[in-house]
């Protein structure tokens, strides 16, 4: 990992990296910051472990925890109808195609959307950039791009890609779940996360886009001459339009946090210490939650050209499903992930995992240089995923 990361720094492909990993007991701890970051002024500083990182889709895990806390509070249920809480979701039809004159064809939803569907990407809500039909509909009917920033329900106005519960496609389900949390709690998603997730773990340095706290901006990796708006462009591969166009908390992609703090959340789930959720609720996160139809659709997505992105480092031969919070391995991988390891990431540059069977969790955040070399980022993330197990194994051999 060290030599591979340094080689990428030396060739100018990345600026640095932050890696944090631990076992449940905190006996094995590996925290390392490599390289340097550039300040908005152009000045360079060594990468620090407490630098504030853009989580992008790694936000989804934290939003999942918040939603499950609302389930524990009796405010929501995993399989309940969300129509009264999110009528905008209930009003969505399923896009089935277009007529010869390009008018959309759609069917009414056969069943209500549930929280579990939102958390597992089986609700039918898809990102437009992953579904050509939704992209086509959006180009014709969605709100003009240059209007004022939008809330979740204003940005994701497009129809469903498939009948709720019958398919799988990556999408804004966690953004909707975050709004559902806000509506049942009567506050902002950030307020709820701070009180119920961050405060119990001693986390004080987090904010949804835009980061306005000056103490955080001083440590914000993504505030630099290449990204003066701190959109997280180097994490998501350029642009940053979703942050720029959004207003309010987007539970699918909007959080900024340090690597040290993110691994606190991973460790709490790994240890199942009751700090965030009751043990049974954490156990439930590490179960396959896709029904037969959605699981078949998930397998098709994994075999598609987008499959490498959706597999987050697992081999095509490895049996996987989808838990509450990320991809779930359904079998052991020799020398690496144990069965029921939960894993996902953020953009092109960040990845995390929780392996309860082998008692290890970690996050690796590569600080890319624009334009982002996606293939190299995939290789570097994979180096982290495997080398951290080698380091853990070597440590255990010395105990």
UniProtKB/Swiss-Prot annotation:
It is an enzyme of class 3 (hydrolase). The keyword Hydrolase applies. Belongs to the class-A beta-lactamase family. Pfam families: Beta-lactamase (PF00144). It comes from Penicillium rubens (strain ATCC 28089 / DSM 1075 / NRRL 1951 / Wisconsin 54-1255). It catalyses: lovastatin + H2O = monacolin J + (S)-2-methylbutanoate + H(+); pravastatin lactone + H2O = pravastatin diol lactone + (S)-2-methylbutanoate + H(+); mevastatin + H2O = compactin diol lactone + (S)-2-methylbutanoate + H(+). Esterase that can hydrolyze the side chain of lovastatin to produce monacolin J. Is also able to hydrolyze the side chains of mevastatin and pravastatin, but not simvastatin. One of its GO terms (molecular function) is hydrolase activity. This is Lovastatin esterase. Coiled coil: none annotated.
């Amino acid at each position: 990992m060290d030599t591979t990361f340094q080689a990428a720094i030396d060739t100018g492909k990345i600026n640095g990296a932050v890696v944090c990993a631990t076992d449940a007991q905190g006996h094995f701890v590996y925290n390392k910051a490599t390289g340097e970051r550039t300040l908005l002024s152009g000045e360079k500083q060594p990468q620090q472990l407490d630098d504030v990182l853009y989580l992008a889709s790694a936000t989804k895990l934290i939003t999942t925890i918040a939603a499950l806390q609302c389930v524990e509070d009796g405010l929501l249920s995993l399989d309940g109808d969300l129509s009264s809480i999110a009528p905008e979701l209930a009003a969505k039809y399923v896009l089935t195609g277009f007529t010869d004159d390009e008018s959309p064809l759609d069917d009414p939803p056969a069943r209500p959307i549930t929280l579990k569907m939102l958390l597992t990407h089986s609700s039918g809500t898809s990102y437009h950039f992953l579904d050509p039909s939704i992209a086509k509909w959006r180009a014709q009917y969605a709100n003009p791009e240059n209007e004022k920033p939008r809330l979740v329900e204003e940005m994701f106005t497009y129809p469903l890609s498939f009948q709720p519960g019958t398919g799988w496609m990556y999408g804004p389900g966690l953004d909707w779940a975050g709004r559902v949390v806000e509506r049942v709690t009567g506050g902002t998603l950030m307020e709820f996360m701070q009180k119920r997730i961050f405060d119990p773990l001693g986390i004080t340095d987090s904010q949804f886009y835009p980061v306005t706290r000056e103490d955080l901006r001083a440590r914000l990796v993504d505030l630099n001459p290449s990204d003066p708006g701190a959109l997280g462009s180097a994490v998501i591969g350029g642009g940053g339009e979703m942050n720029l166009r959004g207003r309010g908390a987007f539970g699918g992609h909007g959080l900024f946090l340090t690597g040290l703090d993110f691994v606190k959340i991973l460790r709490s789930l790994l240890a199942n210490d009751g700090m965030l959720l009751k043990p049974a609720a954490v156990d439930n996160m590490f179960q396959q939650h896709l029904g037969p139809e959605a699981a078949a659709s998930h397998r098709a997505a994994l075999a598609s050209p987008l499959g490498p992105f959706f597999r987050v480092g697992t081999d095509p031969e490895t049996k996987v499903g989808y838990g509450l919070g990320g991809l779930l391995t359904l079998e052991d991988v020799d020398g690496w992930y144990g069965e029921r390891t939960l894993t996902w990431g953020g953009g092109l540059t960040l990845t995390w995992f929780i392996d309860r069977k082998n008692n290890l969790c970690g996050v690796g955040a590569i600080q890319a240089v624009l334009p982002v070399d996606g293939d190299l980022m995939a290789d570097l993330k994979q180096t982290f995923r495997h080398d951290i197990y080698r380091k853990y194994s070597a440590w255990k051999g010395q105990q």
